[in-house]
């Protein structure tokens, strides 16, 4: 794509008014070595169009929410009807009840749900609730799992799994994260060691059941069930962060695939149909501790606003239709199979995997196990950056980070998938 001038000009202007020129760091394309990002003008279906009128097949989908594709006609119509009746009331509305009922119907492990405005708000609230319910302070998270930008989650492992949390962002006091313990994903020994040392102090484990913020790493056989068991043994809560996987890998989320019941679940992305929304829910006994039913405070000016609720209701209605996830999964599988076959044809060190409408790209042989954050760091990250640049220049918009999962929508056509595979095949051949 030769014409990128308007994006370049806009990025230079944006940097004068917005820190780094973007409102979320990954959007700057800095992690993939690009000088500037593409500024998007509009989107429709499986495509993004930038301010220079370049067209891209979109495999980000606004980082997951756009499971129906951009500007789905039914979702737009529902939103437009609601807009005429008001944007936000600051009072309860029927749409909140309807969306809550739909979520509980599709995720039976959730008995009650509270709406917030983002995934970060959802995880913050779930952790606060878990601490209050257990009367304990320490939490366990996993290296490489992202749960939003709250202070208590911005923690690196330090020198070993037993280290107390050390902040990895300036502005996060050590006292804030001293109760955040970090374990290694898929490593039960690291979890057991933490429980042995802090047995009666651990309020909860929070985990992405499929780690979508270190590309796409699946839990090894029995890992999630073992987390459930060790939480039960120690009267700690298990929180599944399904902001990314909820209604994306399956209609009932990852918990329905692995048949493991969390105490609390956090949601976002798909449940808002592209509008800002998050939620946390779980056992009624626990959720009844949330204000005003109980003492655990949580509030939000725009929480449960009718626009986001309406978009979520229509989105969940559509993805609940028989055969939806079969079709979505088939699209992702076709993409992944084609990429793997292309890499194999040229003996290129690459493999891809998928589940539902989510996929991961790994620049290493399929004979190399990638089960942890450390494993992912050993893959060819430089080659991913080259692949990203090549695909972007040829009209395929991938996540601008080797640590992020990709997303496919029901709007992607066979032609879109075939074009993507053909471009990748050419890259594998030339590199």
Curated annotation (Swiss-Prot):
Q: What is its main location?
A: cytoplasm
PROSITE patterns cross-referenced by the UniProt entry: AA_TRANSFER_CLASS_3 (PS00600)
Assembly: Homodimer.
Q: Which reactions fall under this protein's catalytic activity?
A: (S)-4-amino-5-oxopentanoate = 5-aminolevulinate
Q: Which domain of life is it from?
A: Bacteria
- Essential cofactor(s): pyridoxal 5'-phosphate
Q: Which UniProt keywords apply?
A: Cytoplasm, Isomerase, Porphyrin biosynthesis, Pyridoxal phosphate
- Under Enzyme Commission nomenclature, its number is 5.4.3.8
Instruction: List where in the cell it is found.
Output: Cytoplasm
Report whether Ribonucleoprotein shows up as a keyword of the record. no
Give GO BP annotations, semicolon-separated.
protoporphyrinogen IX biosynthetic process
Record protein name field: Glutamate-1-semialdehyde 2,1-aminomutase
Q: Which organism does this record belong to?
A: Francisella tularensis subsp. holarctica (strain FTNF002-00 / FTA)
Pathway field: Porphyrin-containing compound metabolism; protoporphyrin-IX biosynthesis; 5-aminolevulinate from L-glutamyl-tRNA(Glu): step 2/2
